[in-house]
A protein has these predicted regions:
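Conserved catalytic or metal-liganding residues and their short signature motifs at active sites
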Residues: 1-196, 201-202, 206-255, 262
Length: 263
């Protein structure tokens, strides 16, 4: 009987020591570790992914911890682990949804091809996947520009933060939504767009602007894109715009190299 009790005590202390080691001893990842937890992952699958990345010591201890803490919801997403942390701290991050975001900087003048490459460089996916959306998903702008053949000109330049759980269409939709917000602020609407909208949107400095008839959104965006490609110097854009609009008024070809892109 004493031998049995001794073995039992040793087992209890052994399990307790193992739990203390797994639960409370901090773990330092070997460099930056990105862990992608996709929607629908079970607690067991999450634990396996964390242990494989060297973020926790034991998947079994993680599962026990999770069960004894009322099975708190663990958020799907991509996580970056690069600092020493206890298992409880790892669990807390997943409960909070402390998801890693990728910053994408889209400068003025970027074409949809440049944007696609920037998205790929940020680690958000393939440039070809983004282009497939940008070149075909016209539904995102069908109310603004029914005749548009792509999203070119409607992917607003800005600094964005995206997660890897967002689809390429989600990313494009965010950029189009930013375009809509700015377009609404400057009065660029399907019925009220004019050449002066180019001044307001920032592609031409304030000052004398070419006169002309009202233009729809598609024509205004196309002209803005041509002017921006023609010169990178803001002070020159008013002159370029004046030349182009005068040519249009006289029904003369623009003779602008960038117009080939937007033909």
């Amino acid at each position: 009987m004493r031998k049995f009790l001794a073995i039992l005590l040793l087992a209890v202390f052994g399990v307790g020591g193992w739990l203390a080691w797994a639960l409370w001893l901090p773990v330092t990842p070997a460099g930056q570790k990105f862990v992608m937890l996709r929607p629908g992952y079970s607690t067991r699958r999450i634990a396996v992914e964390l242990q494989a990345a060297g973020v926790i010591k034991s998947r079994f201890a993680f599962i026990l911890w999770h069960r004894f803490h009322r099975r708190q919801s663990l958020k799907a997403g991509e996580y970056l682990f690069d600092k020493t942390a206890r298992m409880s701290e790892v669990n807390d991050r997943l409960v909070r949804g402390d998801i890693y975001v990728h910053t994408v900087v889209i400068p003025e003048g970027f074409t949809m091809f440049d944007i696609a490459q920037a998205i790929q460089d940020a680690g958000l996916g393939s440039s070809q996947d983004f282009l497939a959306v940008a070149q075909s998903d016209r539904e995102l702008i069908s109310d603004l520009a029914p005749d548009a053949r792509s999203l070119e000109g409607y992917l607003f330049p800005n600094t964005y933060e995206f997660t890897r759980t967002q689809s390429m269409r989600d990313i494009a939709a965010v950029m189009v939504r930013q375009f809509r917000q700015v377009a609404a602020q400057i009065g660029l609407t399907p019925t009220g767009a004019t050449p002066n909208s180019l001044t307001t949107i920032g592609l031409i400095p304030n000052g004398p602007t070419p006169s002309g008839q009202g233009m729809d959104v598609q024509k205004t965006v196309t002209m803005a894109s041509i002017i921006e490609k023609e010169t990178a110097v803001p002070e020159e854009r008013a002159v370029v715009a004046s030349v182009y609009y005068n040519r249009l008024a006289r029904k003369i070809a623009l003779q602008a190299d960038p117009s080939v892109i937007y033909a």
